[in-house]
């Protein structure tokens, strides 16, 4: 339930990046900026679903500390920084930097998503909290 929803949200975020990358590659800066705004929102909403809803539910059972949830939060921080740098490169109309940040974003995000999908979401499915209520809470973040 949660694993499927969050995995699909990963795919949806990925799908928003592809046309953005194409616009950057073609130096269509107005279009790139138009695409960047909803892309960034989708990514930040995804992180908020995890950090504000899912992770606290999980931490009730597994604790915080420096385990997998802590690592995911740290990676979110790094990815946020890359997304911000990507936006700055788009505003500066710097194709090389924008494509570089985009490539870094894709590599980091693919590795990050794999860890979440294979480890964290699987763990979440096994913990004894109300999955339906949690899913509804996460969906409110997206709206």
Describe the predicted segments one by one.
Residues 1-143:
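Small-residue-biased structural context
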